Swiss-Prot record:
Keyword line: GTPase activation, Repeat
Domain GRAM: residue ranges: 146-213, 293-361
Annotated protein name in UniProt: TBC1 domain family member 9
Domain EF-hand: 886-921
Organism of provenance: Homo sapiens
Amino acid sequence: MWVNPEEVLLANALWITERANPYFILQRRKGHAGDGGGGGGLAGLLVGTLDVVLDSSARVAPYRILYQTPDSLVYWTIACGGSRKEITEHWEWLEQNLLQTLSIFENENDITTFVRGKIQGIIAEYNKINDVKEDDDTEKFKEAIVKFHRLFGMPEEEKLVNYYSCSYWKGKVPRQGWMYLSINHLCFYSFLMGREAKLVIRWVDITQLEKNATLLLPDVIKVSTRSSEHFFSVFLNINETFKLMEQLANIAMRQLLDNEGFEQDRSLPKLKRKSPKKVSALKRDLDARAKSERYRALFRLPKDEKLDGHTDCTLWTPFNKMHILGQMFVSTNYICFTSKEENLCSLIIPLREVTIVEKADSSSVLPSPLSISTRNRMTFLFANLKDRDFLVQRISDFLQQTTSKIYSDKEFAGSYNSSDDEVYSRPSSLVSSSPQRSTSSDADGERQFNLNGNSVPTATQTLMTMYRRRSPEEFNPKLAKEFLKEQAWKIHFAEYGQGICMYRTEKTRELVLKGIPESMRGELWLLLSGAINEKATHPGYYEDLVEKSMGKYNLATEEIERDLHRSLPEHPAFQNEMGIAALRRVLTAYAFRNPNIGYCQAMNIVTSVLLLYAKEEEAFWLLVALCERMLPDYYNTRVVGALVDQGVFEELARDYVPQLYDCMQDLGVISTISLSWFLTLFLSVMPFESAVVVVDCFFYEGIKVIFQLALAVLDANVDKLLNCKDDGEAMTVLGRYLDSVTNKDSTLPPIPHLHSLLSDDVEPYPEVDIFRLIRTSYEKFGTIRADLIEQMRFKQRLKVIQTLEDTTKRNVVRTIVTETSFTIDELEELYALFKAEHLTSCYWGGSSNALDRHDPSLPYLEQYRIDFEQFKGMFALLFPWACGTHSDVLASRLFQLLDENGDSLINFREFVSGLSAACHGDLTEKLKLLYKMHVLPEPSSDQDEPDSAFEATQYFFEDITPECTHVVGLDSRSKQGADDGFVTVSLKPDKGKRANSQENRNYLRLWTPENKSKSKNAKDLPKLNQGQFIELCKTMYNMFSEDPNEQELYHATAAVTSLLLEIGEVGKLFVAQPAKEGGSGGSGPSCHQGIPGVLFPKKGPGQPYVVESVEPLPASLAPDSEEHSLGGQMEDIKLEDSSPRDNGACSSMLISDDDTKDDSSMSSYSVLSAGSHEEDKLHCEDIGEDTVLVRSGQGTAALPRSTSLDRDWAITFEQFLASLLTEPALVKYFDKPVCMMARITSAKNIRMMGKPLTSASDYEISAMSG
C-alpha cells in the first residue's frame, strides 16, 4: 500500500535491493522467506528475531519502495507491501506514470515535492473512495493491528486494545516477544532463531490473575485457567499492563454474568494535534471508563455520569478559614472536589444547582480564582487553577446542556439514568435542596396519587410517622437525647451548609457514627447515598413506573407477593394493608425498572426499612442506589456480589483475625454467616433499632463499614468460637451475641427480634451497645480502604463466577447424563464447546440477539441457546453425517427437528439429544433420526438455505412449487397439446411462510416431550412422500461421498432406493383412488422409473456425482386467470422428458437447460423410456385447469419431460428400515461406532479465519508451539 513519505537514512541496512532506477528502489527484507525469496540462512534468522523483538513493521510489510534523487543521501519510503505481487503493482505504476515525468524537472527539491504530493494525493483519493475515516490511532498501532489479526487469525471484529513487550516462561526458558491484549483475548507471539511460539487465551477462561514478586523475578504476572498456568515477566510498565488486564478480565466476567457486551465509546474528545499519540483510541476509552468508575464511586453519582477531566486546585473552606489542597473533578452534570488529605473535606455541586460561574480577580494570595454560586445561596471559591479559562469554558458548555426537562415516556422506554434533567423549584425540607415536582393541588410540592383503591397512598409521609409509638415511662430521657442529636445536625448545617452542596468533613462522619435522628434519617440517607441526584433528575419517573407496572404479573411479582408478609412482620407498619401495599408498589416498580434483577430475596427486608424512614418515591430511589451502585450484583438471581464479598471477608478474616481463621474455615461458618449479614445489612440478624444505625453508617461509608463490623463481631467472640466443636454451636454463639446488640438511644418501643423469640437460653447474654461496637470496628479495622476492597473483589469475582460456571456445567451434565449415551467427560467438553460458541457469537456478532439466547433465570439446561448459524458450524465439526456441500441442508433439517418449541433456538439438551442419536444410537435410532429429519416439510423458500437442486432453474422456480399429479387420462385438448411438443406442468402457488411454519408445528407436535413415548413407536411416524424420499436419498448419497467404501455404499443405496420405489408403487394399489372424470385414455410409464437413474447417475472413475432435485417457481409465475399469459412468461424454460412425444408421460425429475446442452452430461443419466413397454403404461388423469403447457425449444428432437411428483406414493419407516437391512454395507456403515472425543478435540483445536463457525475450546485456542 502507499504510505505517507517518511525519511530513511540507511537504505541498505537489513534490506536487499531487488530493482532500481534513477529515482526509485524496490527492496526486500533480509530473512523474508516468502515468495521464493529464501530464508537468508543465519542472517535471516537473526533479522527475523530482531524484527519481532523490536516490533519492526517489516514483519507486516517485508517489501518496500524508496524514493531518492541522484544527488541526495536521504531516502523516502513511499510504499510497502506484504507480498511480491502487491509491491510489483506499485513499482510498475511508478515506472509507467512517474518516471518519464520526473526527468522533466531540473531542481531536485521540485522533484521531491512533486513525488511527495503525488503519493499523498493517491492516499487521500483512496481514503475518499473507500470512505476511510480518520481515527486517533498511530501508524505504528495500525501495523500492530494488522500483525495481531494475521498472526492469530482473528476477525476484524476483534479489537486490539494495546500490546506490550514481555517474556513468556515456557518451562524454565523465557521467550521474549509481544503480548497483545484485545477485548476478548490475551495473546502472545514470539519468534526467536526460527522458532515460533503462539499463545491465545480467552478472558472468559481465566480463573485467576495475579501480580507476584519473587527473588528471581521481581515482577511477574500469573495467568491461570482451568487447565494451566502462564507466567509473563520483563514488562516495561507492569502496573499499567496489569491494570489493563484486570479491566479486560472484568469485562469478560460481566459478559458471563449478564451477557453485557463491550461497545466502544465514540464520544471521547479527539486528542489535540500537539498531544503525542501514544495509546490507541480503545485504550483511551478503557482508561476513561476506569477513571469515571472511580469518580462515580467516590462521590456516589449516577451510573451514566462520565468524567470529563480533573485538575489540582485549592478550595476556601469558610468553616475553618483555610485553603485546602485537593482536586477538582468536572463531569457533564457535576463539579466535585476532594482534599488530598483523606476525609478532610469533599464537595459535590450539581450543575442543576449552579447559578453563577465567574473568574475572580487574581492576587498573590489567591492566584487564578474561580467562584461558583448555587441556588441555595452558597458560594464556593477555588484557586490555583492551571488552565482556568479552559475550565470555565467547559463548565459553561455543560451548563448550556443542562436544560430543564420534564420526564417523558420516551425517556422511560429508553434510558433510566438520564442525568441532564433540571427542574427549578424551592427546597421542601430542612436537609434536602433537591427540586420537587410541584402541582397546583398540593402545597407541599409532593404529588399525591392513589394507584390502589384498596390502600391509602403513602407518597406524602413515611410509615414511621404514621406508626410511631413511644413508651411513656421512657419518653423524657430518650426524647431529650434525640432532640440534642437534631440540634447538633442543625448546627452542623448552619456551619457547613445543607443539602447536596454541603461540605462533607470528618465532623459529618462523627455525627453519622453517633446515630442519625429519626426525623432526619430518610432525607440524610438520600443525601449520603447519592439517591437524591437520581430523584431530582427524574421527576415523575416513579409514579409513571408504578402506573405502568400495576396489574401486570410475572415471576418476579409472584415472588414479591409471597414475601410481602415476611418483611419485618414484627413491626406494626407491616401488619396491615397500608404498609404492605407501599412495599408491593416499590418492589414491583423496581422489578419492572430492572428486569435483569427483578426481585431477589432480602430486597423485601431492606425495602421495608427504607419505607419506614423515607417516603415511597424516596425509598424507591434508595433501593435503586443500593442495588445498582452500592451493592453491585448483590440482588441478582445468583447473588454473585454477595458471594464475592463473602470471599473478600474470608481474606480479611485471615489477615485481621488469623487465630480464628483456620478454626472457622474447618467449621465452614464464615461462608454461612456472611451471606445473610451482607445481603440484609445486618437487618435480619440484629434487633431493628440497632440495625438501622448500621444502615446509617453504610449509606455514608459504603461496604467497608459492613466488613469492619463483621470483623469486630468475630473478634469479640474469638474465645467462644475457638471452643466450638461444630458449625451449629458457632452459629449459636454468634446469633446470641448479635441478638444482644442494643441501641439505648432509640425512642422506639423494643421490637422483639426473630432470633430472640426463638431463643430458649436460660442465661441472658450481656448487652452490647451498638455505638460502642461501631467505634471498636473503626479503631481495630478502620485501616481497611475502599480501593483495597475493590482489588480483592476483582480477584474473588473471577473465582466466584468461574465456580458458578463450573457448578452450572456439573448440574447440566448430572441432569442429562442419564438421557444420553455420552460419558460425563464427553458431556462436559460438549457443554464447554456449546457455551463457547454462544459467547463467541456475543462478541463477534450473530444472526440473533445474544440477550435472547441467554437467560440466567431459566433452568440450567436452557440458559444458553444457539441459533442456526451457530448450530451449522458445530454440526459440521461434530456430527458424523456432515459431509460435502449438502452439510448445510442436513444441518437445517436437524435444527428444524430439534427446535421443538419453534423459537429458532435450541438449548443444550436438544443439541445433545440429536448428537447422541447420531453418534451413539443403535441402528434403528440412527435411521429413525434420519427419517424424521426428512419427514418434516421443506423450509420456507425465503430462508437462506443452500439450494439442493439445479442452479440453472433456480431463477425461474422459486415460490411456486410444482405439484406432482398422477396422469391417468388425457382428453382431446390435452392430447393435442402433447402432440404439439408441450409439456404438462401442474403449478400450485406456495402458501407462504406462515402456512409452512404452522405445518412445521403440526409435524413437531409428534415429538414434543408429552408425546415422546408415542413417538418411540415407529408405526406412529408419518409416511414419507415421494419428494421427501428423494431428499432422503440425496442425503444418504452425500453422506457416503467421502467414505472409503463409497462405491459399495452407493450401489447398496441404489438397490435400496429401487426396492423402496417398488414398495411405494405397490402401496398405491391399496389407496382408494378418487373418482375420475373422463375415460382411461392414453397412458404413460410409471412415475418412479426415471428416479433411480436421476438420483444415482452412472459414475466413471474420478467423476463427481451430480445430484439434482425439484426447485419451486417464483411468485411472478403464479397461475393467472388467463392460462396463455403464464405460458408466455415461461416460454424460455426448456423442459425435457425421457418419454416419446406421442405418449403422455410422467417423470420425477427436472433437468436444467444447461445440462441438456451438454451431451456428456445427458448421457450419464440412466433414463428409462416408458413408451416401448405397453405393460408398463399407467392411466393418466385429465389435465386440470391449473395445468400450464410450456413449449419446448428443442422441437421434435427434444424429449418432453414431466416435473410432476406422485402424490399418492408413500413409504413408512418400517419399510425404510426393512429395505435398508437387506444391504450389509449400509448396516455396517450405520452400526459403525463414532469416536466422539476425537471430534471434540478437533473442534477445540480448530481455528477459523474470519468469523468462526465455532469458537476455540475450553481453554486455549492454540497450544504453544516451537
